[in-house]
A protein has these predicted regions:
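Bacterial N-terminal signal peptides
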Residues: 1-9
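N-terminal targeting leaders of membrane proteins
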Residues: 14-113, 206-257
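Generic detector of well-ordered alpha-helical segments enriched in charged/polar residues
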Residues: 79, 159, 175, 187-191, ...
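Mid-length scaffold segments of soluble, non-membrane domains
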Residues: 96-183
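Contiguous hydrophobic segments
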Residues: 127-144, 197-203, 238-257
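Cyclophilin-type peptidyl-prolyl cis-trans isomerase
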Residues: 170, 181-226
């Protein structure tokens, strides 16, 4: 199960067109990443404390400690060395390529959630970036973002779609390598996995893991100077609770968009 989910890591986070959900990137999960997201920018309607059942606390806490240690001991040093070695522009090209590749996830979930303007915009951006951005390496729409952004934010994955359909989180979960999730979001990972073109690449299991790991190291390297995960956890009395509550609030915001 873990190996299967590892192959789908960060699909929903990157699908949003952001660099990644900061927590998911930090613990090799979305993001949701990279896009890069700001937990402090929630609308007033989300200021009220959001909660979710956490009956698997000891399982979750164990894997949270594991993921956090792995981040600080391995993934952050790797991303730091990679950022020192490779200039920012090529790393941005790599990020653009993977974001562009996840077009099917965004398009399908925009259609499923009735965001037809966002679906149309995703098609337009995909064609433009693929045709004129060297297969997605360049983001030719970035210079005029107001011309390419739909009225409502684009859907980021099947977890958001399930939430809009009325499915609650279920219980809170933390997966090794993937980071924070829930029953609903874990089911969403499966949908994202099967809509991700990379899933169907002619690669061995180890090659697939290597490609996805590289994708996440690259995304993390672009977040090092403004790392929301570290900002969130460094001053927290209870790092586990801080990450859990921020994640639930973030997903509630995405579902309401």
């Amino acid at each position: 199960m873990t190996a299967f989910l590892l192959l789908g890591t960060a699909a929903s986070a990157l699908a949003a067109g952001e660099l990644s959900d900061p927590i998911e990137v930090a613990q090799f999960s979305s993001g949701q990443i990279g896009e890069e997201s700001d937990f402090d920018s929630f609308d007033d309607e989300y200021d009220e404390y959001q909660t979710v059942a956490d009956p698997l606390y000891y399982w979750n806490k164990t894997w949270f400690v594991f993921n956090d240690g792995l981040y600080h001991a391995l993934f952050k040093p790797l991303a730091t060395g990679y950022a020192w070695l490779i200039p920012e522009r090529p790393r941005t090209w790599v990020s653009n390529f993977f974001i562009n590749m996840l077009f099917p996830v965004r398009f399908i979930n925009n259609v499923l959630t009735g965001k037809f303007d966002a679906a149309y915009m995703e098609v337009s951006k995909f064609i433009a970036n693929t045709a004129f951005g060297l297969g997605g390496l360049g983001d030719v729409t970035a210079d005029r973002p107001h011309n390419w952004e739909p009225e409502r934010p684009t859907a980021d994955g099947f977890g958001q779609t399930l939430g809009k359909a009325g499915f609650g989180h279920g219980v809170y979960l933390v997966w090794p390598f993937l980071g924070p999730s829930s029953i609903r979001e874990s089911v969403g990972f499966v949908g994202d996995y099967f809509c991700d073109p990379l899933t169907y690449a002619d690669l061995t299991f180890l090659e697939m893991v290597a490609v996805r790991a590289y994708k996440n190291v690259n995304a993390l390297s672009l977040e090092l100077e403004d790392n929301n995960y570290e900002t969130l956890t460094e001053g927290a009395v209870d790092k586990y609770a801080a990450v859990r509550d921020a994640y639930i609030r973030y997903r509630a915001k995405k579902v309401a968009e």
